[in-house]
Amino acid sequence: MKFVRTILVIVVALCCMSFTVVIDAGHGGNDAGAIGHVLKLKEKDLNLCVAQRLANKIQEQYPEVNVVMTRTTDVFLQLQKRADIVNKNHADLFICIHTNAAENRKACGAETFILGTDRMEDNLDVAMRENAVMKLEQDQTVYQGFDPNSIE
């Protein structure tokens, strides 16, 4: 949380006007995400818990920041709907929470991905993994032919 606090302090200080953060709790509804080996915890539930706690922390410490959650309950949101929420609220910062799984049981800690405009292989791997949820959606025409399995 210290990292997020530092980012918010810098960004809010630089912005004289209102500032909006959209927090996206990844997965949800019929998309469970990763499931833990031992406790069988579902990623969607952990993501929602972390996202809600982060939103509360931001609101407590920075009441001038407008915090918007993409979901506050266990519902499935299409990727397009998540993007619509970000765009409709003119987000200055978009934070997407995921609690990824690892085959190595000794693995622990946090991952932070900041996807820029460079076409790095790691960015493509993350995008392909996270966009695979599109396969669960009924209407994929909103993506105008985007293939979640393609590296292009």
Which role does the model predict for each range below?
Residues 7-16:
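Bacterial N-terminal signal peptides
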Residues 1-6:
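Positively charged n-region of N-terminal signal peptides that target proteins for export
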